[in-house]
């Protein structure tokens, strides 16, 4: 246990919390340009071809972000918006593409959970 005198001389230092999404720099989303759009395979025990994009952000950071939903229209030089959120079975992927904003189209024929995929309300 420290004495009052010791604390007066040298106060306690609080630990800094490390961010899971450092490239966003505290912002909720960031704009960027796709430098490469490709598919990659997940870790064991899963098996698939996950769609990801390498993105150069406006702050100069280059990150890998996941393209959720069925089908997408992204290609090189597409301007996209990314948000935080990792993909557990893809190492190094800590960001998600925001569907339905900027150059990214929403998911077609999406009926449920539409807001997560930028899909408009269907005509009833």
Swiss-Prot record:
The modification 3-methylthioaspartic acid is found at residue 89. Disulfide bonds: none annotated. GO terms for molecular function: rRNA binding; structural constituent of ribosome; tRNA binding. Transmembrane segments: none annotated. It comes from the Bacteria. The keyword RNA-binding applies. InterPro entries: NA-bd_OB-fold, Ribosomal_uS12, Ribosomal_uS12_bac. PROSITE patterns: RIBOSOMAL_S12 (PS00055). Keywords: Methylation, Ribonucleoprotein, Ribosomal protein, RNA-binding, rRNA-binding, tRNA-binding. With S4 and S5 plays an important role in translational accuracy. Belongs to the universal ribosomal protein uS12 family. Part of the 30S ribosomal subunit. Contacts proteins S8 and S17. May interact with IF1 in the 30S initiation complex. NCBIfam families: rpsL_bact. This is Small ribosomal subunit protein uS12. It comes from Methylococcus capsulatus (strain ATCC 33009 / NCIMB 11132 / Bath).
